[in-house]
């Protein structure tokens, strides 16, 4: 049986990184600072891509490595794929 893994890099992150390919409907266990939770995946997730581990409102930061890496362009539910279709940059043009 294949063991599929995810990683929460920093306790303040709101996304996990997938270390395997996952299918929608699979359940992943996550250790948070508030306790262990199980997350049902709402989308197929490719290796190396991000999974929302907390609900993220539109306009809210996407946090990975304990740092903001972008902002949600729409509401993102727990278990959803987090990628360019629902994340924008957080940089202002000069």
Where are these regions (language model features)?
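N-terminal small-residue-enriched
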Residues: 2-94
């Amino acid at each position: 049986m294949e063991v599929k893994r995810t990683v929460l890099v920093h306790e303040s992150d709101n996304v996990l990184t997938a270390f395997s390919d996952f299918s929608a409907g699979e359940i992943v266990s996550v250790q948070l600072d508030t306790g262990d939770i199980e997350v049902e995946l709402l989308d197929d997730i490719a290796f190396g891509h991000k999974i929302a581990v907390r609900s993220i409102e539109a306009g809210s930061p996407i946090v990975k490595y304990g740092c903001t890496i972008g902002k949600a362009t729409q509401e993102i539910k727990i278990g959803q794929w987090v990628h360019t279709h629902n994340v924008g940059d957080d940089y202002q043009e000069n």
